[in-house]
Amino acid sequence: MARQRVGLLFGGKSGEHDVSIVSAAAIAKAFAQEDNPDKYELLPFYIDRNGIWHDPEISQQVLTAGKALPVETVDPASRWQFPPAAPSIDAWFPIVHGPNGEDGTLQGLLTLMEKPFVGSKVLGSAAGMDKLAMKMVFAQAGLAQVDYVGVLRSEVWSGPCVFPKVCDKIEAQLDYPMFVKPANLGSSVGISKVRTRDELEKALDLAAEYDRRLIVEAGVTAREVECAVLGNDQPKASVVGEIRFDSDFYDYETKYTDGKSSMHIPAEIPGAIAQQIQELAIKAFQALDCRGIARVDFFYVEATQTVLINEINTLPGFTALSMYPQLWQQSGVPFPQLVDRLVQFALEDVPQA
C-alpha cells in the first residue's frame, strides 16, 4: 500500500513561533519511529515570521536546527503561494501555535484546500482560542469556572476619564489577587498576577499590547491539573496529570524552562475527582465541537473538593516538556502511536460526498 503524505506545518507569525518549531521536531521524530515510516511520508513546511511558507528542504533545516534559521529574501508575492509539494499532501498536521495558527484561520485555509487535517475545525479552534468566547460556551454547558470580567483594549487605552471606571468595575466584581490575560494568546504570554490597583492598571496595559480582547480572572487557591482528550465523536480522556511549580504562577518562563516546573502523572488526587475531571474534559471537548485533539486544564480546589474548568487548548504543545503526549504515554499510547492515531482521526473526519 502506498504511503500517505503528511504535511507538517509549523512556525507562524505569533509569539509562540519558537515553541512551534520544538513541537514540530518532536512530532517529526515520532513519525520516524515504529511502523510510521511504512505508513507515512512526512514533508515539513515551515512558515516563517513573515508568514511565508517554505519548501520541505528549507523546512527540514529548521527542524534539524530546532530554531528559526536566516532564510534568503523571498519575493513578497510568494507569501500567497504554496510550495510546489503542497498539492501532493494527503493530510496536514498543523502545529502552528497562537493567532493565525490555532484560532481557526489556518483551519479555514486547510478546509478550503479540501484536505484532511489534524485537530479541530474552524468553530472549535476559534472558540477554543478566544478565552472570552470559550468561557461563554463553558457557562452554557454548565461547567463551573472562576469568576471573570471581560475588557476591551479600547477601554484600557481610552484615557484618564474612562480607564479608572474600568478598573473600578473590575474591583467591584473580583477580589485580589487577580490574573490579567490577553484573550487570544497561549503559552502564558502576556499574563500577569496582580494584587493592587497599580499592578492591575499596568497588567491591563501590558495585555492590551497583545490583544484587543482581555480577560481578568479571580485568583483561586488550587492545584493545577490537566487531562488530554483524543478522538472525534467518541473521544477518550487520558489519566489526569498535575503541574507543580515554585514560581508565583505558571508563566511562559516556568512553562518552557527545564527545572522550573514538574509534571506528576498520574496526579495524586482521589479517584472520584480524577474520574470527574475526565468526564468534564470530554464534556468541554464536545461543547466546543473539538476534533481529534485537545488538552483541558482545571483547578482542583482541595479544601472544598471542587473542580473548576480553566481552559481548553485545541492544539497543545508537543515538546519534550509538554503535558499532552506525556499524559497519553502514561495512558498506554506512546508518542509514535499518538501521531498515527491523530492522522487517522483526521482522515476519518472527512465529509462523505
From Swiss-Prot:
It catalyses: 2 D-alanine + ATP = D-alanyl-D-alanine + ADP + phosphate + H(+). InterPro entries: ATP-grasp, ATP_grasp_subdomain_1, D-Ala_lig_Van_CS, D_ala_D_ala, Dala_Dala_lig_C, Dala_Dala_lig_N, PreATP-grasp_dom_sf. Residues 135-344 form the ATP-grasp domain. GO terms for biological process: cell wall organization; peptidoglycan biosynthetic process; regulation of cell shape. Its main location: cytoplasm. It is found in: Cytoplasm. Mg(2+) 1 binds at residues 297, 311. Its EC number is 6.3.2.4. Its cofactor is Mg(2+); Mn(2+). Pfam families: Dala_Dala_lig_C, Dala_Dala_lig_N. One of its GO terms (cellular component) is cytosol. One of its GO terms (molecular function) is metal ion binding. Gene3D superfamilies: 3.40.50.20, ATP-grasp fold, A domain, ATP-grasp fold, B domain. Keywords: ATP-binding, Cell shape, Cell wall biogenesis/degradation, Cytoplasm, Ligase, Magnesium, Manganese, Metal-binding, Nucleotide-binding, Peptidoglycan synthesis. ATP binds at residues 171-226. Mg(2+) 2 binds at residues 311, 313. It comes from the Bacteria. Pathway: Cell wall biogenesis; peptidoglycan biosynthesis. Binds 2 magnesium or manganese ions per subunit. Belongs to the D-alanine--D-alanine ligase family. Cell wall formation. This is D-alanine--D-alanine ligase. It comes from Picosynechococcus sp. (strain ATCC 27264 / PCC 7002 / PR-6) (Agmenellum quadruplicatum).
